[in-house]
Design a protein with these regions (language model features):
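Ligand-binding loop in jelly-roll beta-barrel domains
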Residues: 86-106
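A short, N-terminal "cap"/entry segment at the start of jelly-roll beta-barrel domains
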Residues: 1-40, 46-48
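Short acidic-glycine-tyrosine-enriched beta hairpin
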Residues: 70-86
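Short histidine-centered beta-strand/loop micro-motifs
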Residues: 27, 46-52, 69, 93-94
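Short, conserved beta-strand element in jelly-roll/cupin
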Residues: 51-67
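Histidine-centered metal-chelating micro-motifs
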Residues: 46-47, 81-82, 86-91
Length: 106
């Protein structure tokens, strides 16, 4: 059964850009996220509607990523993070300069 509370969670604090990727991965692990890795997409890449079995965190390192869920779209840029709930149908669109981000799940 899919949770009725399927909204994107936006963390408004801007991550310190000097923080190393390792420190960001460590932070995600402290929050209970696992399998963290860096992913890089080419400009204008698109991911059609899909789901993940587990909650997924995305920490944008460079570029931008637009996520759409329940008809709501939000663009995330370097230093921002969004969490997508488990089993939430969503799509993603990458910006004109590509996107490099950490992704992890719990």
């Amino acid at each position: 059964m899919i949770s009725t509370d399927q909204r994107l969670t936006h963390t408004s604090c801007v991550y310190n850009r000097l923080m190393q990727e390792r420190a960001l991965i460590d932070q995600l692990q402290r929050e209970g996220f696992a399998n963290a890795y860096v992913w890089e997409d080419t400009p204008h890449a698109r991911y059609p509607d899909h789901t993940h079995r587990r909650e997924t965190a995305h920490v944008i390192l460079s570029g931008e990523l637009t996520l759409t869920m329940n008809g709501e779209s939000k663009t995330y840029r370097a230093g921002e993070r969004c969490d997508v709930p488990a089993n939430a149908v969503h799509s993603a669109r990458i910006g004109s300069h590509g996107c490099r981000y950490l992704i992890a799940e719990r």
